[in-house]
Amino acid sequence: MKVSTKDKIIESAVMLFNQKGFSGTSVREIAKSADVNVAHISYYFKGKGGLMEHLVSEFYEGYSKTLETAASNISTQSTQEQLLQLVFDILSYQHNHRQLTRFVYREVTIDSTLIREIMSTYLMKEKYIFQLIIEEGEKQREYLTLPLPHFILQLKSLLMMPYLQPQYISEVLYMQPHEPYFYKMYFEEIKIWIRSVFRTGDVALTN
């Protein structure tokens, strides 16, 4: 199947942004790598900034759909099982889009108008869905043993770490985060943590 000009630009941009960073990559380099004219980038994305906005939005659109699918199963699974399924789906999504994931997670650490917009839409939705799952669990007497913001912070750290520190993981820990076995093994470790921060009973340990 022939790759479209737009898709070639996207693939080259993701590769170069990962290798050289957004600021260190020029429009000409992207065009050369994609074997297209510089004018094509202006036509499809209005320049490098528009290209980055497209990539970030594309990533979070897919990420958001993963969260929404989990939210649709609230009434059919226990809180822990639902969180575990959500975590596995997120890890799978990140692995299947690992170069894009790495680029986006680096960019969201930088304060900008685009990132503030992402925070107010996609990431607020993410918080809402996590909170909804936990609140539904409380109705079934499944309680977190730590405050919800702390739980979300720790979970997000676990999910993002492999894509923020891939060199550390491969060069220091001698693991291969790009291999499918890694995220499946990593999921098993997150599962242990999730099991450890819940209790069942009549009263929660935290507010």
Curated annotation (Swiss-Prot):
UniProt entry keywords in alphabetical sequence: DNA-binding, Repressor, Stress response, Transcription, Transcription regulation
Keyword Membrane: no
Keyword Repressor found: yes
Transmembrane residue ranges: none
Entry protein name: Probable HTH-type transcriptional regulator YttP
GO biological process terms, semicolon-separated: regulation of DNA-templated transcription
Signals that turn on the gene: By phosphate starvation, via the PhoP/PhoR two-component regulatory system.
GO molecular function annotations of the record: DNA-binding transcription factor activity; transcription cis-regulatory region binding
Residues annotated as domain HTH tetR-type: 3-63
Superkingdom field: Bacteria
InterPro entries the UniProt entry points to: DNA-bd_HTH_TetR-type_CS, Homeodomain-like_sf, HTH-type_Tx_Regulator, HTH_TetR
PROSITE patterns tied to this protein: HTH_TETR_1, HTH_TETR_2
DNA-binding region, residue range(s): 26-45
Signal peptide: none
Biological source species: Bacillus subtilis (strain 168)
